[in-house]
Amino acid sequence: MFSAQQPGPPPPNQPGAPAGLMSTPPGAKNPSSTLVDDLESSFEACFASLVSQDYVNGTDQEEIRTGVEQCIQKFLDVARQTECFFLQKRLQLSVQKPEQVIKEDVSELRNELQRKEALIQKHLTKLRSWQQVLEEINGQHKKTSEMPQGPLAYLEQASANIPAPMKPT
């Protein structure tokens, strides 16, 4: 869905703002707003369109759908621009300080190893408990197989489990 849509050119820099973070879309009310501000306002507009009093009062369903879709599309466009900005900054960082990127990669790999080790330990614990259950079942099976297997074996086994009557004193 998103792969066919190419992000637009990066927003122009404005004095006094972090490079590239300023956004001046055509027709914008606030020319000094940042991408983050635009993202926040478009996100709020998505919710505002859903709870608008016009929609509650019974406006045409197609009109509601169109308005919501426009708000969501604007939010997605600004989100793509913001993502593009951060990807550009990440690329600049990787060119200027490649050791920092390597440190981050090593840290991520260590965290992944710790997570996987914990998962292995969890599975080993479960495996040991199931092995114990199987050993108990095998032990019970061996006890029953040691019992005599004659025609009266069932009665002998059942009577072995009945406690002897107590003698009155």
Swiss-Prot record:
Task performed by this protein: Component of the Mediator complex, a coactivator involved in the regulated transcription of nearly all RNA polymerase II-dependent genes. Mediator functions as a bridge to convey information from gene-specific regulatory proteins to the basal RNA polymerase II transcription machinery. Mediator is recruited to promoters by direct interactions with regulatory proteins and serves as a scaffold for the assembly of a functional preinitiation complex with RNA polymerase II and the general transcription factors.
Keyword Nucleus tagged: yes
UniProt record similarity statement: Belongs to the Mediator complex subunit 28 family.
Gene that this sequence comes from: med28
Signal peptide coordinates: none
Subunit relationships: Component of the Mediator complex.
Gene Ontology cellular component terms for the protein in this record: nucleus
Coiled coil: 99-137
Stretch list, region Disordered: 1-35
Record protein name field: Mediator of RNA polymerase II transcription subunit 28
Classification via InterPro entries: Mediator_Med28 (IPR021640)
Keyword terms: Activator, Coiled coil, Nucleus, Transcription, Transcription regulation
S-S bridge residues: none
Subcellular location: Nucleus
Pfam family membership, one: Med28
